[in-house]
């Protein structure tokens, strides 16, 4: 199975730790690719609608290549820190640009990992969860999981062996 992980964090901290734990569990026979939006040149969506006429974004940047890679996946894992009660701008920008070929994302297996600086009962996680549920409903995604983690210091998640084991287990579960 082809798994594309979109890392919405520009930092090498807790979100990357979560991604690596999931990827370790999913390794097996899966082809895993991590997309790092902060390393790409992707202009914000202008809402021009030209993509609907030209079968892709008309911006001369990394959008179409990135969307091709996402569309080719059997599973998409969205991973993000919480920024101001929502997903990171880096992840949101990639999601916004998926509009140009959104129907190619129908029926995908998906998962969501969110790491924030507040306890997981905080409303910020619920807001992000609900947004992904709406996307999943619209695009008929098979949402395999949504996991939220509370971590403030750079290595908090790396010290949480229970969370790391659960993330590896989630990775192994996608092989079934």
Located regions from the model:
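N-terminal beta1-alpha1-beta2 submodule of the flavodoxin-like/Rossmannoid cofactor-binding fold
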Residues: 1-79, 85-101, 145-147, 157-176
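Acidic, low-complexity intrinsically disordered regions
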Residues: 80-81, 137
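Short glycine-rich anion-binding loops that position phosphate/pyrophosphate groups of nucleotides
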Residues: 82-84, 117-118
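Short, glycine-/small-residue-rich phosphate/pyrophosphate-handling segment
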Residues: 106-146
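A short acidic, helix-capping loop that chelates divalent metal ions and anchors anionic groups
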Residues: 115-120, 151-157
């Amino acid at each position: 199975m082809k798994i594309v992980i979109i890392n919405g964090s520009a930092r090498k901290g807790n979100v990357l730790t979560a991604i690596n734990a999931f990827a370790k569990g999913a390794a097996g026979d899966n082809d895993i690719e991590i997309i790092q939006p902060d390393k790409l040149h992707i202009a914000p969506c202008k809402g021009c609608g030209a993509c609907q006429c030209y079968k892709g974004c008309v911006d001369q940047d990394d959008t179409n290549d990135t969307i091709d890679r996402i569309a080719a996946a059997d599973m998409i894992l969205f991973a993000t820190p919480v920024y101001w009660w929502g997903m990171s701008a880096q992840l949101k920008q990639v999601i916004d640009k998926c509009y140009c070929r959104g129907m190619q994302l129908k029926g995908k297996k998906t998962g969501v990992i969110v790491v924030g600086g507040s306890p997981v009962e905080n409303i910020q996680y619920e807001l992000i969860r609900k947004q992904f549920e709406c996307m999943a409903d619209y695009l008929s995604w098979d949402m395999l999981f949504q996991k939220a983690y509370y971590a403030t210091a750079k290595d908090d998640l790396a010290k949480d062996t229970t969370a790391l084991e659960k993330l590896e287990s989630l990775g192994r579960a996608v092989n079934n």
